[in-house]
Amino acid sequence: MPTRTSLSTLAGTYPILGRPLPAVLSTVLPDGRLQSTIVWFACDRQHLLVSTMREFAKARNLRLCPAATLLVVNPDDTTDWVELRANVSLEEEGAQDLLDDIGHRYTGLRPYFGQVVPADLAATEHPVTCRLTPVAITTPPPVPPLDRPAVLSTSHTQPPPPRLPTPVGCGQDADLPADHLDLLDAPLAGALATRLPGGFPQTQPVWYAREGSDILVNTTLQRRKGRNLLADPRATLLIVDPVDSSRWIEIRADVDLSTIDAEQQLNALTRAYTRHTHYYGEIYPLDQRNLETRIIARLHPRAVHCDAIHR
């Protein structure tokens, strides 16, 4: 399981938060789906600060459901990441100054209106600060050594795996834009957002593969995202161009879960993303396959959004 750390160590424990890296902010839409977008952020003692505009969807989402998840991934090592689930307050006082500070942090330019984006946008866009107060911090779990003593399966003492949901069937798929298929066909780290039982988004890096108009992600029934999808088979996948963070594709999807050929698909992802050919035995200990049930999460796109408003 991912590890959770005391909030008192937030500033000093996570050097990644001190870097001007694009982050993924996931918020809850009125229909219960999740919106994931790229944001710039800053740290303020025990808070994270994100600047957006009063008119933007994420601000509207947060007015209705003031909970969000921020994911920051090290672009040099995608196994190094921090996920922060937070309660959010929206503040307009001082929002313009913070917007200028964050814009300068990421671009070296100020003011935001006039240097980062055209000055005339100030007439129609009104800054608001999203103050995130973390309630949970998650980091990657340590990978067990390949030569660890064999762990015996305890499946005989556990209830059988839950029955997988009935496939969602043939809904109205959203088209995947041809000019963004390069992001879907490259071995990049995607950010998969699912709903936790309490309503918070869970957003963590995943491997993925495109199969026609569907996107395939591999997980297990025992992991949190697998349990989330059993309870609510909807997810949002965000993939960002590593060269230009204003270019991205966000896919809101219905999800089918299947155990059929799940380990074979996992090995295909392993070959695409690493120098290895098999996940179990080369990345994770071989006996781990006896401790978990692999599933393919097939994402059927229902809505697709691309690119930042200002590029």
Description of each model-found segment:
Residues 1-7, 75, 80-175, 242, ...:
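Charged, gly/pro-rich active-site loop segments
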Residues 2-23, 164-190:
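Short, basic/aromatic recognition patches
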Residues 13, 58, 95-98, 180, ...:
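Amphipathic alpha-helical interface surfaces
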Residues 14-15, 60, 120-122, 181, ...:
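Short secondary-structure boundary/capping segments
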Residues 16-17, 62, 102, 132, ...:
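A generic structural signal for nonpolar/aromatic side chains embedded in well-ordered alpha-helices
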Residues 20-54, 60-62, 68-72, 81-84, ...:
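Short beta-strand segments
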Residues 56-57, 77, 224, 244:
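Short alpha-helical
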